[in-house]
Amino acid sequence: MHIKQTRKCVACRESKHQNEMLRISRVNNAFQLDITHKMGGRGAYVCKDKKCIDLTIKKRLFNKSFKSNLEENIYMLLEEYEKNN
């Protein structure tokens, strides 16, 4: 039996296949942008859609997901990704 790998976006709350999303991973209290979806640790997802990325950056939605304040560089990485794609 094949299991669908769907995840919920922190911004729009829609469930989509994880390949359509960006993942932020927390491993040993260090946060990283996980493009390959292969890092271990706790993760949270955002759609690759511009609106979702903008809302996530504006409202710092990953802080709520991880119940912790993320370093500013994570949100800067999201901005970079958005500009380049």
Say what each PLM segment does.
Residues 17, 38-42, 46, 59-62:
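Arg/Lys-rich, often Gly-containing low-complexity segments of ribosomal proteins
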Residues 18-22, 53:
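Short, non-ligating residues that shape and space the ligands of small metal-coordination modules
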Residues 1-2, 8, 22:
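N-terminal cysteine/histidine-rich coordination modules
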Residues 13, 48-53:
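Cys/His-coordinated zinc-binding microdomains
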Residues 54, 58-85:
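C-terminal structural segments of small proteins and small subunits
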Residues 27-42:
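Short linker/helix segments within small regulatory modules
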Residues 4-6, 14, 28-32:
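N-terminal, polar/charged subdomain of small-to-medium soluble alpha/beta proteins
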Residues 6-9, 44:
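Residues immediately within or flanking Cys/His clusters that coordinate Zn2+
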